[in-house]
Amino acid sequence: MKSPLHCFLSAIVVIVFSLSVSTLNVEGQGQTIPYDKIEILTDKIAPNLYMLSGSENVDPGHPDGAGGRIGVLAGPDGIFMVDAQYLQVGDKVISAVRKIDPGPIRFLVNTHIHPDHTAGNATFAKLGAVILAREELREGMLRTAGGDPARLPVITYGMGEPLKLRMNGETVELIPVRAAHTGGDTMIRFVNADVIMVGDFYRNFGYPFIDVANGGSLKGALEALDLTMKIAGPNTKLIPGHGTYIKRTDIVPYRDMILGVQAKVQQMIAQGKSETEVLAAKVTAPYDAKVPGGLLPAGNGTSADRFVRMVYQQLKDGK
């Protein structure tokens, strides 16, 4: 028999379902995604570690790869997954995972709350996977995401020491990141393979997206980049949530770009300039040609204008 608490929570989830995933402040919001055209591509990057990515030029919010990247650690101890993609491509993801290993999917950890990384959670929970994530992520889902209660994390953790799992000859570290891309970010480090999945606080396409509505912050994003450079070695393979793999040295110009824009915006705020005036000044001009997608129209989710507006608002609020 279900407990009163379980029934109550289920009722709350049903009520907020009308808000749906679309209420989350995410890239590509309001744009139609042709889910039927998304193919799942598999890349083996270590003896038992694989990356699954959606096909390029399909998802308007992520032309560099539809949906969020998935990590798959396979072996005799079962399967450990990182992120779950869109709900609508769940069967395709399952098929790709089964081609790697037919064993049980035991654990799934979310890097952050956005539905291109979490909407498929329920698909894998119903296959027996235990979902792990930051406590802030679970709280955010209960507030806004709605949908199937099975998609909620059942094991949560906060800031502090990394949570470690040992399976398939690998040590997996779940490293909590202070409010960066969102308020509940986690990096996943595969120690023996020398691989770190960094989620979306680093991006290859367009300017940084700091989702303030879901707890992200400019200061936290910079701290996350610093932490990544600290724990990554010279040969560590860094895997963003979308796009190409990078190394530690690739973070330096990305971080410098953020600091450069931040300094310029701060200077203009000190001069009494309004947000409109700051946007008109095109403070990202020195970087636009170097940032893939940096010259896209202002309405695009990866645009310079959205980034500059966020920087302005964060600095005005003293964050």
Explain the meaning of each model-derived region:
Residues G78-F80, Y86-Q88, K164, T171, ...:
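Metallo-beta-lactamase
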Residues M1-V13, S22:
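Bacterial N-terminal signal peptides that target proteins for export
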Residues S95-R166, G183:
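Active-site HxH/HxHxD metal-binding segment of metal-dependent hydrolases
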Residues V26-P47:
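Short N-terminal segments immediately surrounding and downstream of signal-peptide cleavage
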Residues K44-V97, T186-F190, D194-V198:
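Conserved beta-strand hairpin/beta-sheet module of binuclear metal-dependent hydrolase folds
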